[in-house]
Amino acid sequence: MRNIKLIIEYDGTAYCGWQLQPNGITIQQVIEESLEKMLGQSVRLQSSGRTDAGVHALGMVAVFKTQKDLPVRAFSDGLNCLLPPDIAIRDASEVPLSFNPRADAISKHYRYTIYNSKRRSPLTRLNSWHLRGILNMELMQLGASHFVGEHDFAAFRASNCVAKTTIRRMFHVSVAKVGDSVIIDVHGSGFLKNMVRVIAGTLVAVGQGKLDPSAIPGLLAGGDRSASGITAPPQGLCLMEVFY
């Protein structure tokens, strides 16, 4: 038996997220169906996590087991011939059977992109949140610094989040202006459902002058989701890399 690790890039616009669902097409479903067509066997992917509908990935990690005696390169090349244009295998490698992409992950890097311009851009509408008003970068950067470290992120998660613990450690949270885009990078040990999107929504409130950056430690300590910013729309979010 072999354990094949895939690094997957996808545009999540047309999908109901990563994970298999009964009432919608998902990225996992499309890849599994392509693998079954290629290998002639039933395949179940095990991933490093999940992404919601409309969220993208540059570095989703997933593994599957097979007894097929094919060169590793054949798995990525074969899949890329079968997959639709919005899903691609960036790399394939053979890993120990014990490798678990979720349990063995040390940290993850997410990026949230805001297109900050008075004019809308058709070319960025599927991978960024369009905001017309001016955002104060200095205040957003100050706000971002308060998320670094180990905190209880109960106030920065979806209402239906069922995580056993809401404690997470953030190694790096930054805000940068690149042309008309505002880039929020978040690198942490793990994430709650919608956590990065709520952090982004909160930092936008700071940039708009609706929330003082000094209020963020109180939000973290209070654990009240209603006191934090809105959940930023999904299309601005991208899973950049999973670290092992």
UniProtKB/Swiss-Prot annotation:
Q: Which residues bind substrate?
A: Y110
Q: Mind telling me which Gene3D superfamilies this protein's record contains?
A: Pseudouridine synthase I, catalytic domain, C-terminal subdomain, Pseudouridine synthase I, catalytic domain, N-terminal subdomain
Query: What's its top-level EC category?
Result: isomerase
Q: Which UniProt keywords apply?
A: Isomerase, tRNA processing
Organism domain of life? Bacteria
What the record says about family reads:
Belongs to the tRNA pseudouridine synthase TruA family.
The subunit structure is: Homodimer.
UniProt protein name = tRNA pseudouridine synthase A
Coiled coil ranges: none
| EC number(s) recorded for this UniProt protein | 5.4.99.12
Q: Does the keyword Isomerase apply?
A: yes
Please report the organism this UniProt entry assigns to the protein. Answer: Geotalea daltonii (strain DSM 22248 / JCM 15807 / FRC-32)
Which residues participate directly in catalysis?
A: D52
One GO BP on record is: tRNA pseudouridine synthesis
Pfam families in the record, alphabetically? Answer: PseudoU_synth_1 (PF01416)
Instruction: State the gene name recorded for this protein.
Output: truA
Q: Is tRNA processing among this UniProt entry's keywords?
A: yes
GO-annotated molecular function = RNA binding; tRNA pseudouridine(38-40) synthase activity
List the cysteine pairs that form cystine: none
UniProt-listed InterPro entries = PsdUridine_synth_cat_dom_sf (IPR020103), PsdUridine_synth_TruA (IPR001406), PsdUridine_synth_TruA_a/b_dom (IPR020097), PsdUridine_synth_TruA_C (IPR020095), TruA/RsuA/RluB/E/F_N (IPR020094)
Q: What does this protein do?
A: Formation of pseudouridine at positions 38, 39 and 40 in the anticodon stem and loop of transfer RNAs.
CDD domains named among the record's database cross-references: PseudoU_synth_EcTruA
